[in-house]
């Protein structure tokens, strides 16, 4: 995944017929076509700096990763390599890792399928608890810390109060009423609650924004695409990969040839978090929607990456199958309109084959940022049923958080200090 931004910072000196990877071409084109006010929300003079080596204009924001040595932290490191807008300059972790280089701190626990980026290997790990020290080095942070929920809530607020925006992968603040929980294609307007949060925190720049649970990525976007048909009752069963627990088969050999029919806390998250995505801002807080009613079972299955969901839906305005497929294929959100660097060109793909989506074939659709849907058909008890698949550590974790940060930058909430 780290190679996705290869050459993204190059200028257009090479033609489109040169040997520049296609993704790099798209990233550069996106940077050129974004409105100046979105690329540089504080104005060109403040937000653009000159690359001393080649004289080119660049405007990378300095990023810190909290919890950088864990699986999600590693995914952040991997995804942000050569990112056109963001540069990892600080990595922070527990006191036992502090003082070591990132390479030493991770040791043999690098779990990505691509090599550790050279740019981060020699960065000295900072103590995540030294909030002021860490915050002084960055423009904003991604949070993937492994602590108790109360500890996470406290430390993320500490960072926000240093006027450092926090984009969190953690669940601790997902139900804090004035903290936006966002899938940028679904509810980017919820970022507007930040101004109320800042009043509570006493900040002008610092805030917390979070992304939702990985389990809902395979069906919440689909139900959003079908909103006009008024889905009101949903039954879902999720089949969740072991990387969602921060594990590989090497770490968790007992998961081979095994299924565990329980994942602590996942069913409640899977039932309630979509309703918050579909909620509205009222009196400075986010009020969740009340429909559709969702009931869910979550199973851990012997797959490394990729959460699959089998979903049944009832509609108040029952559509045809063709209408549902058309809605999926036409669905896009703000990231697609702005052509943000991490945004999939086509958020949802519908697959006609009876044996799709498959993890082995489809989990990396749109670099892991897209959602794959198949087996849509009428049901004898519900109106329709389908199968969804998403990448749990990309779209469902670090990648989703990176897209949130890109959206926040485009909307002017994240700027250089």
Residue ranges and their predicted role:
Residues 10-13, 26-31, 203-207, 288-293:
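Glycine-rich, flexible loop segments associated with nucleotide phosphate handling
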Residues 32, 60-62, 385:
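Residues that mark the start of a beta-strand
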Residues 2-51:
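Sequence/structural signature of beta-propeller domains
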């Amino acid at each position: 995944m780290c190679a996705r931004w290869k050459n993204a910072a190059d200028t257009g000196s090479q033609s489109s017929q040169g040997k520049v990877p296609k993704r790099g071409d798209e990233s550069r084109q996106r940077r050129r076509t974004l409105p100046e006010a979105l690329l540089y929300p504080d104005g060109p003079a403040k937000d653009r700096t000159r690359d001393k080596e080649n004289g080119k204009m660049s405007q990378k924001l300095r990023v810190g990763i909290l919890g950088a040595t864990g699986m999600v932290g590693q995914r952040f490191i991997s995804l942000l390599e050569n990112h056109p807008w963001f540069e990892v300059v600080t990595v922070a972790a527990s006191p036992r890792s502090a003082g070591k280089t990132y390479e030493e701190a991770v040791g043999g626990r690098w779990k990505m399928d691509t090599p550790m980026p050279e740019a981060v290997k020699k960065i000295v790990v900072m103590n995540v608890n030294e909030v002021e020290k860490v915050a002084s080095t960055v423009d904003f942070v991604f949070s993937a810390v492994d602590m108790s929920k109360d500890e996470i809530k406290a430390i993320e607020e500490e960072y926000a109060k240093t006027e450092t925006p926090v984009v969190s992968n953690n669940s601790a603040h997902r139900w804090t009423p004035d903290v936006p929980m966002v899938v940028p294609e679904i509810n980017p307007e919820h970022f507007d609650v930040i101004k109320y949060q800042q009043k509570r925190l006493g900040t002008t720049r610092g805030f917390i924004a979070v992304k939702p649970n990985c389990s809902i990525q395979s069906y919440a976007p689909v139900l959003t695409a079908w909103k006009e048909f008024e889905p009101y009752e949903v039954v879902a069963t999720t089949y969740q990969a072991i990387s969602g627990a921060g594990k590989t088969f090497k770490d968790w050999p007992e998961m081979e040839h095994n299924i565990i029919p329980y994942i602590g806390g996942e069913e409640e998250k899977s039932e309630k978090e979509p309703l918050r995505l579909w909620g509205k801002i009222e009196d400075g807080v986010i009020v969740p929607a009340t429909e559709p009613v969702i009931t869910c079972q979550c199973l851990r299955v012997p797959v490394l990456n990729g959460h699959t969901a089998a979903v049944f839906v009832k509609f108040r305005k029952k559509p045809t199958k063709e209408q549902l497929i058309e809605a999926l294929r036409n669905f896009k959100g703000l990231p697609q309109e702005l052509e943000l660097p991490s945004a999939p060109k086509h958020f949802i793909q519908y697959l006609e084959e009876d044996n799709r989506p498959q993890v082995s074939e489809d989990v990396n659709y749109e670099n892991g940022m897209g959602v794959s849907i198949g087996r849509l058909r009428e049901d004898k008890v519900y109106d329709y049923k389908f199968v969804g698949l998403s990448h749990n550590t990309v779209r469902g974790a670090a990648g989703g958080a990176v897209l949130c940060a890109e959206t926040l930058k485009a909307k002017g909430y994240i700027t250089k200090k």
